[in-house]
Design a protein with these regions (language model features):
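Hydrophobic transmembrane architecture of multi-pass small-molecule transporters
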Residues: 111, 132-232, 238-244
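Transmembrane core module of solute transporters
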Residues: 1-123
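Generic "edge-of-domain/loop-turn" microfeature
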Residues: 83, 101, 220-221, 236
Length: 244
């Protein structure tokens, strides 16, 4: 189950912030943001049967390790997104991420459910589903904390460097809350030039926090690739993963 937890940790934790990036930083509507995520979904659909065929021929070890490594590369690539990057810059990395996740998801299912006794197949499937949810929850919480810490450390310095009015603790907390989801804390009464400066600082700070979160997610995916090396032949020639 460890591999499944790490997979969902990296995937859900990282994707949680992409919605804020696409909608709040780039101003896309939910449909536009969803369209940018479609390449990953498409590659999952295309890659799953191919991964299944490969796993049937060579076992799950190589596909899982290769998939987690590819996912780590994609997450590292996403860490390079800046506030002024084009939303379309995400496409190639989402394609790689989808291709990387396909063999991992198929391989994990094959190892967990396929190697369980017939009478326990339902239990094995339930455990896999639970591991996926735990991993996603942990990823969102941990990477959210990492991003929040990065924003908290960077925002006051950037704010002061721009010679903006000093903030009291309550105001600073409100600004951090807005910036943590990629929003700029400006109102209709904010002078246009000041609003532009605040918006630039907010988006750049959010992008910096997202950069750190994606680096952590890439590291987790790489750890999953290393764990995938533990896969070894099981009883009866089947492939079993000792750490699941």
């Amino acid at each position: 189950m460890v591999l499944v937890v790490l997979l969902m940790f990296a995937l859900f934790g990282a994707m949680f912030f992409m919605t804020f990036y696409l909608e709040n930083v780039h101003g896309l509507d939910p449909v536009g943001a969803g369209v940018r995520l479609l390449p990953m979904t498409a590659m999952l659909i295309v890659g799953a049967p191919l991964a299944g065929a490969a796993i049937s021929r060579i076992g799950p070890r190589i596909p899982i390790v290769a998939g987690m490594t590819l996912a780590a590369v994609a997450l590292f690539g996403l860490s390079g997104l800046a506030a002024d990057s084009s939303p379309n810059d995400t496409i190639v990395w989402f394609v790689l991420l989808g291709l990387g996740l396909s063999p991992v998801m198929v391989g994990a299912t094959d190892v967990i459910v396929g190697n369980a006794p017939v009478e326990l197949a339902g239990v094995a499937g339930g455990l896999q589903s639970t591991a996926m949810q735990v991993g996603g929850t942990l990823g969102t919480a941990v990477l959210g904390a990492v991003m929040s810490a990065r924003i908290s450390g960077l925002l006051p310095t950037s704010w002061a460097a721009a010679h903006l009015p000093a903030l009291n603790p309550d105001q600073l907390a409100g600004v951090k809350s807005a910036v943590s989801v990629g929003a700029a804390p400006v109102t209709s009464s904010t002078p246009p030039q000041v609003a532009r400066v605040i918006t630039d600082i907010s988006h750049a700070t959010f992008a910096s926090g997202m950069h750190t979160a994606f680096l952590v997610a890439a590291g987790v995916a790489l750890a999953g690739a290393l764990i995938g090396l533990i896969i070894r032949p099981g009883n009866g020639g089947a492939e079993a993963y000792a750490g699941l």
